[in-house]
Structure formats: structure tokens, C-alpha cells
């Protein structure tokens, strides 16, 4: 028996069993995996369905909330709209009622005004009736009085006729002439008075025209003098040099010039204060020369002060000559020119006296020419009318008396002498030119802005201070400083000893208190300086 086929059959059966087992196992495994996959898919689908259901539920909730919110808003808007309509209805009703009230009030006001007007009309009519009644009563009384006057006149005429009937022709003519003369005398007096008034008005008009023409032809512009001068410094370091060691430079400067030096916080400026324009000009020139030279010490200050005093004298002469040529009087005596030049540094109520004199001279010449008088002589008289003011501080007497004596001394024309003497009414004017100059003087002084009373009073007080100090024996110089709050007195050392200085200060203080009126306090300073000078050769 061939075993090979059996073995092959068995082997084939075994292989078939194995293959069958493997197939069955594979099928079983495949079925399990399919079942698991199906389960997973089912779970996934369930999860998806649950998520979808939840989302749909959320959407339904949100939609419900939106619908609820929309319903609330609509309800709120409807409520607001209802409230607005109700408010508008109430406002309209209130406005209508208020308009009706205004109309009622307006009608009442108009009715009240109408009643007031009617009341006023009735009052006016009542007053008019009362006035008419009073007027009729007055007229009735006037008529009664006139009737009485007429009756009285009739009686007088009857008596007059009875008297005339017994007169002769000559007597009747004399009576008629007397009555006519009495009637005409009043008319004649009226005509004479009218003629005099007409002449006066015409003369005033002519005089005004002459004065207006004269004033329009004069251009006399000048500024009221001040009491301060400023000097500009190159830099603020110069202030210390001006003061000097222990203040010796500034003390020397003030003592020699009589001018107060004010050094304050104002940058690069030094102020020179003093009421005397000549002293102030000398001080200004000296200060500028010191700043330019650079050497600032007491000896140099003294040297420059003396030099500038001489320079001022020359300038005074030049001022006088220029003024004389300006008004057409070149033949004026040289000494009178110099004296007139001093008026450049003199003020009267703040008005520069030299410019005032030139203005008066020009006005006088123009007015004299209009009136047919000697214009040259009028200009000369007007120019010299205040010449006494140039030296009235050195010579006793008023400026009128001093000016009159100067004019006589230098043999001026008698008309000029009388003009100077009479321009303030001290003596009677003897010529038309004297009257013209007085009028021109008043015109120049009265021009608005020409003079300042307060400045003149201030300067007069300072002058009085110095005059009181100078009235004591042994006083060399005195200077009013600090706007009149200090009087500094320089004494002669050979006449006033040290033990007398205190007594002198006390006496000056007492005299100031008894003779002057001033605000605040016045410091009295007396300085006695002994100086010995020698030269080494």
C-alpha cells in the first residue's frame, strides 16, 4: 500500500484544517473588528447627535432671549412714545392757556393805559380850564385897571387943556420943545450907547484879529524845564569809581557843584538832581568829562568844575548873541547880550525865560507892525522886558526894578526903559509899545502848557532854603539837596570854629521852621573844611 498518498491526504487534511482554522479565526477576528468599529461609529454618531442637540438648544435659548429683549425694547419705546405724546399734549395745553393769559393781561394793560390817558386828558383839560379862567380873571382886572388909567388920563388931559388955554404962544412953544427934547434925549442916549458898543465890538474884533495873526506867525515851541539830568555810563562798574573810597569822590562832586548825585539800581545811569539849571549843567558837563577821561578823584573833579564854569560863561554869551540876532537886535550892548544869555538857565513857572523873551519880542514886533508902530523898537523892548530876572538872585530888588536900572545904565531908549518898568503895572505905561509888550507878555505866559505853578513853587522853596542859610555870617556856600530835604552849608573855616558849627545848625533849623512851610523833615548839615595847599618846586 502506497503510504504516500495517504500521507499526502492526511497532510492535505491537516493543511485544510489549518487553513480552515485560520480562515475561521480570521473571519471571527474580522467580525469582532467590524463590531467594534460599528460600536465606535455608533458612539461617535451619538456624540455628534448630542452636540448638535445641545447647539440647537442653545440657539433656541438665544433666539428666545433675543425675542424677549426685543419685546422689552419695543414695550419701552412704546411707553416713551406715549409719555412724549402726553407731555407734548400737556405742553400744548399749558402753552395755549399761557397765551390766553398773556392776551388777557395785554388787554388789561391796554385798558389800564387807555384809562390813564383818559385821566391825563381830563386833568389837562381841567388845568387848561383853570388857566383860561385865571387868564380871563387877569384880563378882567387888567381891563378894569386900564379903564381907571384912561379915566385918570382924561382928567389930566382936561386939566392940561384948561392950563394950555390960559398960556401964550411962546409959553406953549417952550413946553412943546421941552417935551420933545425929553422924548428925544432918551433916543439920543440909546443911539450913543449903541454907537459906543459898536465901536467897542469892532475894536475888540480888530484887536483879536491882530493877536491871532501874531500868534499864528510865532512858532515858539519849548518844553518846561526839569530838575533832573541823566548821564549814561559805559557800564555799572563806573558807579563805584564815581562814589570813590569812603564816598570822597561823590562828596567832593556834590560840594563843588551843589548838585545831588543819585546812584540807584537803574542800570548804566547816574541822575543829577538840582533846581539851579546852571549848576546842573556844570555838573552834567563835569560828570561826562570824568567818564570820558577815566581819572576820577577829588583834584580832577575840582579842576573840571572850574573849567566847565568858564565854558558855561562862554556858552551864556553865545546864547545871548544868538537870541539878539534872532529877534533882529544885533546892535545890543555886549554886556546886555551876556546878561540875556543867563536867562537860558532861568525858568519862570517852568517856562524858559530866554525863550519867553524871544517869543514876547516877536509877538510885540508883529502887533506893533499891525498898529503902525515902530516894530524894531517893540521887539527890542519885548526882548529886554524880563532882563532883571537874570541877576535878581545877586542884586536886591524886584526883577522890574533891576531891569529898569540895567536899561538906564546901558542907555537904552526911554520907551524901552518905560516898557520894562511898566510891564507888570508898577508904573504907568507912557507909550503904545509899552502896552503892546505887556499884552505880548501876557499872551506868552498864558499860553496853555507854557508854565507850571507847582514846579515854580518847588524851586522857590529851594531858593528860600539857600537864602536862609546864606543869611548867616561866615557861610560860604549853601546847597539845597535831596529835593529840598537837606540843606548843606559850607562855612568859612577862619570865621566859624568847630564849636560854633552845632550852634549854626541849630539857628538855621530854627529859622527854617519859623519862615518856611515844607513837607516832612529838612536835614541841616554844616561842613567846615580846612585845606592847606602848597607846591613843591
Swiss-Prot record:
Region annotation Disordered: where it falls in the sequence: 112-148
Domain HD intervals: 353-446
Gene3D superfamilies assigned to the protein according to its UniProt record, in alphabetical order: Hypothetical protein af1432, K Homology domain, type 1
Pfam families per UniProt: HD, KH_1, RNase_Y_N
Transmembrane segments: 4-24
Membrane topology (UniProt): Single-pass membrane protein
Biological processes per GO annotation: mRNA catabolic process
Keyword Nucleus carried by entry: no
One function term, GO molecular function aspect: RNA binding
GO cellular component terms, A-Z: plasma membrane
Keywords: Cell membrane, Endonuclease, Hydrolase, Membrane, Nuclease, RNA-binding, Transmembrane, Transmembrane helix
Domain of life (superkingdom): Bacteria
Main location: membrane
Subcellular location: Cell membrane
EC number: 3.1.-.-
Domain KH stretches: 227-287
Family assignment from sequence similarity: Belongs to the RNase Y family.
NCBIfam families, per database record: HDIG (TIGR00277), PRK00106.1 (NF000997), RNase_Y (TIGR03319)
Protein task: Endoribonuclease that initiates mRNA decay.
Identification of the protein by name: Ribonuclease Y
Source organism: Streptococcus sanguinis (strain SK36)
Upper classification of the organism: Bacteria, Bacillati, Bacillota, Bacilli, Lactobacillales
Amino acid at each position: 500500500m502506497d503510504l504516500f498518498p495517504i500521507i499526502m491526504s492526511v497532510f492535505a487534511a491537516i493543511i485544510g484544517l489549518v487553513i480552515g482554522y485560520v480562515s475561521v479565526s480570521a473571519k471571527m477576528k474580522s467580525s469582532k473588528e467590524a463590531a467594534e468599529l460599528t460600536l465606535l461609529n455608533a458612539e461617535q454618531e451619538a456624540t455628534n447627535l448630542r452636540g448638535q442637540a445641545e447647539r440647537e438648544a442653545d440657539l433656541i435659548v438665544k433666539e428666545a432671549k433675543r425675542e424677549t429683549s426685543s419685546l422689552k425694547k419695543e414695550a419701552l419705546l412704546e411707553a416713551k412714545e406715549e409719555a412724549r405724546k402726553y407731555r407734548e399734549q400737556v405742553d400744548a395745553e399749558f402753552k395755549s392757556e399761557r397765551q390766553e393769559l398773556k392776551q388777557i393781561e395785554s388787554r388789561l394793560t391796554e385798558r389800564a393805559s387807555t384809562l390813564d390817558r383818559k385821566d391825563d386828558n381830563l386833568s389837562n383839560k381841567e388845568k387848561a380850564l383853570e388857566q383860561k379862567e385865571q387868564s380871563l380873571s387877569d384880563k378882567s382886572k387888567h381891563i378894569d385897571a386900564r379903564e381907571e388909567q384912561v379915566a385918570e388920563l382924561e382928567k389930566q388931559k382936561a386939566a392940561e387943556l384948561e392950563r394950555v388955554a390960559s398960556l401964550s404962544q411962546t409959553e406953549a412953544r417952550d413946553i412943546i420943545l421941552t417935551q420933545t427934547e425929553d422924548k428925544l434925549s432918551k433916543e439920543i442916549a440909546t443911539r450913543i450907547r449903541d454907537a459906543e458898543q459898536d465901536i467897542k465890538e469892532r475894536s475888540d474884533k480888530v484887536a483879536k484879529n491882530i493877536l491871532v495873526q501874531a500868534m499864528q506867525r510865532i512858532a515858539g515851541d519849548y518844553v518846561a524845564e526839569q530838575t533832573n539830568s541823566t548821564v549814561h555810563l559805559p557800564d555799572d562798574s563806573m558807579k563805584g569809581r564815581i562814589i570813590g573810597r569812603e564816598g570822597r569822590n561823590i562828596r567832593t562832586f556834590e560840594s563843588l557843584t551843589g548838585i545831588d548825585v543819585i546812584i540807584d539800581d537803574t542800570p548804566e545811569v547816574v541822575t543829577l538832581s538840582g533846581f539851579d539849571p546852571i549848576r546842573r549843567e556844570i555838573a552834567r558837563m563835569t560828570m561826562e568829562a570824568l567818564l570820558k577821561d577815566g581819572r576820577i578823584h577829588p583834584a580832577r573833579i575840582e579842576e573840571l568844575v572850574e573849567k566847565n564854569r568858564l565854558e558855561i560863561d562862554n556858552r551864556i554869551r553865545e546864547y545871548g548873541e544868538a537870541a539878539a540876532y534872532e529877534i533882529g537886535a544885533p546892535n545890543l550892548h555886549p554886556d546886555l547880550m551876556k546878561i540875556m544869555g543867563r536867562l537860558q538857565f532861568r525858568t519862570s513857572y517852568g517856562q524858559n525865560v530866554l525863550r519867553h523873551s524871544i517869543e514876547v519880542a516877536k509877538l510885540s514886533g508883529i502887533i506893533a507892525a499891525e498898529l503902525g508902530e515902530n516894530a524894531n523898537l517893540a521887539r527890542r523892548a519885548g526882548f529886554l522886558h524880563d532882563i532883571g530876572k537874570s541877576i535878581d538872585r545877586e542884586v536886591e530888588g524886584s526883577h522890574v526894578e533891576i531891569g529898569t536900572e540895567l536899561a538906564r545904565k546901558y542907555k537904552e531908549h526911554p520907551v524901552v526903559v518905560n516898557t520894562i518898568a511898566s510891564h507888570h503895572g508898577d508904573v504907568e505905561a507912557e507909550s503904545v509899545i509899552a502896552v503892546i509888550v505887556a499884552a505880548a507878555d501876557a499872551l506868552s505866559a498864558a499860553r496853555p502848557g507854557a508854565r507850571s505853578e507847582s514846579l515854580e513853587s518847588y524851586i522857590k522853596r529851594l531858593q528860600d532854603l539857600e537864602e536862609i542859610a546864606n543869611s548867616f555870617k561866615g557861610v560860604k556856600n549853601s546847597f539845597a539837596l535831596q529835593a529840598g530835604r537837606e540843606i548843606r552849608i559850607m562855612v568859612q573855616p577862619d570865621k566859624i570854629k568847630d564849636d560854633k558849627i552845632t550852634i549854626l545848625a541849630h539857628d538855621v533849623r530854627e529859622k527854617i521852621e519859623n519862615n518856611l512851610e515844607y513837607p516832612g523833615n529838612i536835614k541841616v548839615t554844616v561842613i567846615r573844611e580846612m585845606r592847606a595847599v602848597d607846591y613843591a618846586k
